[in-house]
């Protein structure tokens, strides 16, 4: 997929990446601060195109710009600073993650950056969190790689001289290449297949004459309900691109315009890979009719996910937010620990680093049936299909329904703030909250809690006392009220 080009002057190595579609990304760079020469670029990654949009010299100049002034950086150990540059005179935007690390025996400041045209600003902003999360984890692994290289080869460096030291430092580039390529592929796929801000209800299941015309009534109810219970994050799989995309558009009706731009339709010709961080994404099964979700990427998603199979009409969901985040952090620590303990580059490959920490044995059956029924979505579906299709009535009714959910979420947040004096006291009674806010159905509570979690992150963990309650323990707690 990638070819290594001869290093351009002034000796900056470059890797060109062959992408299937048009890439909005101009380049990605890895730079460092040299105490004598100032900011220097170590490596450039750029999409392989017929027309060169930025010369290597221009990319080097822009990448150097991200480290200017960092000589006085005084950050905590392990800190990663995210910086966003808009250079109107150059017509580009640069997202740069600045961090400290040990490479070639010296502690210095580094910058991992992506460069896009300024015209892609509106395209990129909804994806900013996804990209930053990806780049942040690349840096975590990169720090370990740099430290291991320095630690394991310090004796060889002393014996073989400084030239050997430079060779050892270069070994981080293949690891970075393997991590940067998926980020470029993600942006390329989003450029061609992202869901538009405005969705015509005529392209969704909600435009059917009657409920059940396109899919089974119970399946549609479970899909929308679980989608809302998992903070609007769903993956839709199937054998027909048309059928998958229709469900994707339907679920995206319940998202904000910005969240829709962070969602992706499936490709008819070939299936995309699952990407953590997207809200809704459609994926095609292979020729055998099977599809495997990568455990690592699913665990790294910021919110729990709903899995919807349109071929067999099944809906599965992950545990609630607080449990998902707890498991995510444990898995991340486990992966980095295994990465640290690896004794060879083959052992450090991404596919072989799988929960080897003895203290963490993840449940591979992370998707479970939708256990909690709701009245909110059921009442909405019963009423919306009584309206005449083909007009704007259903769109207006949907907007009213979403407004009601949002108001309920804000009311729930305010209720908890008043009851706890904005977190100064523990929350007293979940039972009273459910009665006072008319959320006695567990599904209704889960939907409003999920929406409130997006407005005020950490609410789940605060309500249930400790962030590591499992779903079973959580239900036991609810039964005591």
From Swiss-Prot:
**Which disease is reported for it?**
Frontotemporal dementia and/or amyotrophic lateral sclerosis 1: An autosomal dominant neurodegenerative disorder characterized by adult onset of frontotemporal dementia and/or amyotrophic lateral sclerosis in an affected individual. There is high intrafamilial variation. Frontotemporal dementia is characterized by frontal and temporal lobe atrophy associated with neuronal loss, gliosis, and dementia. Patients exhibit progressive changes in social, behavioral, and/or language function.
Q: One GO cellular component term, please give it.
A: extracellular space
**Intracellular or extracellular location(s):** Cytoplasm; Nucleus; Cytoplasm, P-body; Cytoplasm, Stress granule
Protein purpose: Acts as a guanine-nucleotide releasing factor (GEF) for Rab GTPases by promoting the conversion of inactive RAB-GDP to the active form RAB-GTP. Acts as a GEF for RAB39A which enables HOPS-mediated autophagosome-lysosome membrane tethering and fusion in mammalian autophagy. Component of the C9orf72-SMCR8 complex where both subunits display GEF activity and that regulates autophagy. As part of the C9orf72-SMCR8-WDR41 (CSW) complex, functions as GEF for RAB8A and RAB39B, thereby promoting autophagosome maturation.
Q: Which InterPro entries match?
A: C9orf72
Query: Region Required for the homodimerization of the C9orf72-SMCR8 complex: what ranges?
Result: 461-481
Q: Which gene encodes it?
A: C9orf72
Protein's name in the database: Guanine nucleotide exchange factor C9orf72
Quaternary structure, from the entry: Component of the C9orf72-SMCR8 complex, at least composed of C9orf72, SMCR8 and WDR41. The complex is formed of two protomers, each individually consisting of one molecule each of C9orf72, SMCR8 and WDR41. The protomers homodimerize via an interaction between C9orf72 (via C-terminus) and SMCR8 (via N-terminus). Within each protomer SMCR8 (via DENN domain) acts as a bridging protein between WDR41 (via C-terminus and N-terminus) and C9orf72 (via C-terminus). The C9orf72-SMCR8 complex associates with the ULK1/ATG1 kinase complex.
**Domain (dDENN C9ORF72-type) ranges:** 370-464
Q: Which Pfam families does the UniProt record give?
A: C9orf72-like (PF15019)
Q: Which UniProt keywords apply?
A: Amyotrophic lateral sclerosis, Autophagy, Cell projection, Cytoplasm, Cytoplasmic vesicle, Endosome, Guanine-nucleotide releasing factor, Lysosome, Membrane, Neurodegeneration, Nucleus, Secreted, Synapse
**One MF annotation (Gene Ontology) recorded for this entry:** GTPase activator activity
Expression across tissues is: Both isoforms are widely expressed, including kidney, lung, liver, heart, testis and several brain regions, such as cerebellum. Also expressed in the frontal cortex and in lymphoblasts (at protein level).
Q: What range(s) does the uDENN C9ORF72-type domain occupy?
A: 23-194
Could you tell me which PROSITE patterns the record lists for this protein?
Answer: DENN_C9ORF72
Task: Specify the superkingdom.
Answer: Eukaryota
């Amino acid at each position: 997929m990638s070819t290594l080009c001869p290093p351009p002057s002034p000796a900056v190595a470059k890797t060109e990446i062959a992408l299937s579609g048009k890439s909005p990304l101009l380049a990605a760079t890895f730079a460092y601060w040299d105490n004598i020469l100032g900011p220097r670029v170590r490596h450039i990654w750029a999409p392989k195109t017929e027309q060169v949009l930025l010369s290597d010299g221009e990319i080097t100049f822009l990448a150097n710009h991200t480290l200017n002034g960092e000589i006085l950086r005084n950050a905590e150990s392990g800190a990663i600073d995210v910086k966003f540059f808009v250079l109107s005179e150059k017509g580009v935007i640069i997202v740069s993650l600045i961090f400290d690390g040990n490479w070639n025996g010296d502690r210095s400041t580094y910058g991992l950056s992506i460069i896009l045209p300024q015209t892609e600003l509106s395209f990129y902003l909804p994806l900013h969190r996804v990209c930053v999360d990806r780049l942040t984890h690349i840096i975590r692994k990169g720090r370990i790689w740099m430290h291991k290289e320095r630690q394991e080869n310090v004796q060889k460096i002393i014996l073989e001289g400084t030239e050997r030291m430079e060779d050892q430092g270069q070994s981080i580039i293949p690891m970075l290449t393997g991590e940067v390529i998926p980020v470029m592929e993600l942006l390329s796929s989003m450029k061609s297949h992202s869901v538009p801000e405005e969705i015509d209800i005529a392209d969704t299941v909600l435009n059917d004459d009657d409920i059940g015309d396109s899919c089974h009534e119970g399946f549609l109810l479970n899909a929308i309900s679980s989608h809302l219970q998992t903070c609007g994050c769903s993956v839709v799989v199937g054998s027909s691109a048309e059928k998958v995309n229709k469900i994707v558009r339907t679920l995206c009706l319940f998202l904000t315009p910005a969240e829709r731009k962070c969602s992706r339709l499936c490709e008819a010709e070939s299936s995309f890979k699952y990407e953590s961080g997207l809200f809704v994404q459609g994926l095609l099964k292979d020729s055998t009719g099977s599809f495997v979700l990568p455990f690592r990427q699913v665990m790294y998603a910021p919110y729990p996910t709903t899995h919807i199979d349109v071929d067999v009409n099944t809906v599965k969901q992950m545990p609630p937010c607080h449990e998902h985040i707890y498991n995510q952090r444990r898995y991340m620590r486990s992966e980095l620990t295994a990465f640290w303990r690896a004794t060879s580059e083959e052992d450090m490959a991404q596919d072989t680093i799988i929960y080897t920490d003895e203290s963490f044995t993840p449940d591979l059956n992370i998707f479970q049936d939708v256990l909690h029924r709701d009245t909110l979505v059921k009442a909405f579906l019963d009423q919306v299909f009584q309206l005449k299709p083909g007009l704007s009535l259903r769109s207006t009714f949907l907007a009213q329904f979403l407004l009601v959910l949002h108001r309920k979420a804000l009311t729930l947040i305010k209720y908890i703030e008043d009851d706890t004096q904005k977190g100064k006291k523990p929350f007293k009674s979940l039972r009273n909250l459910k009665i006072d806010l008319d959320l006695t159905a567990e599904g209704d509570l889960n939907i409003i809690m999920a929406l409130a979690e997006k407005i005020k992150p950490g609410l789940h963990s605060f309500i249930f006392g400790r962030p590591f309650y499992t779903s079973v323990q959580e239900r036991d707690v609810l039964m005591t009220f």
